[in-house]
């Protein structure tokens, strides 16, 4: 199978953040090109890694790429959305783990494979499904969702300030004929954005494409579900490393980690906080870890990456 061409972002930092024990049990929730998985596996002796991906392409590639570890019995692939983490691990007899890693960037091959429809740079059928077996696609969102639903996702998931004129333009065009390709959609989005605004702030379709992709794959819902399960799966001293690439995901992770590591509301004047009220988790880094200048120089996709790490302390 052809190479995955996926440059892993914050590779050293995210795996170091897990404080790998050679005998531990670890989960890579986003296998992708296998960069993080390989780095974890290199440090395991009798430990084991469970690697999730809902994209069969990633699993097929890594069956070859990580064959040594597979043959040695150190690696199990799970073709599933990471929102099923607890169910899938329980079915395999795993109820506690030492570390869980999430890399929430769409893997480069999904962007680069024109026919998957993730990219506004290539003309392709409107698709954007991470899991090719699911029914909901970008075509259905663009052609069948109501004006109000489009408005909601462009605002909420794209933070697009021209959401209304863009949704109107889509509505107008699809009344004439279905919108079938990413190229058509890009041109329609441009119609909804004033010419002066199109000259600044990156590609005019970027925010709308992000919004549709998040809606098609229920990315924020899946992340929230998965993180809630992840904290209950961690053993004491276990850690979760999460790499985000956009503000919505980062805000969700930041809020959740803060809630897990904060004291409950207590009456004023308590001199000593009893142990049973102390939080079970602590933030390993209070501010997100960002890519180094060297990494930014070689990987332009790294510029928006942020790494947050949570540790279970009791």
Swiss-Prot record:
Top-level taxonomic group: Bacteria
Location in or out of the cell: Cytoplasm
Family the UniProt entry places it in: Belongs to the methyltransferase superfamily. RsmH family.
Name used for this protein in its record: Ribosomal RNA small subunit methyltransferase H
Function summary: Specifically methylates the N4 position of cytidine in position 1402 (C1402) of 16S rRNA.
The keyword rRNA processing belongs to this UniProt entry's keyword annotation: yes
Binding locations of S-adenosyl-L-methionine: 34-36, 53, 82, 103, 110
A cellular-component GO term for this protein: cytoplasm
EC code: 2.1.1.199
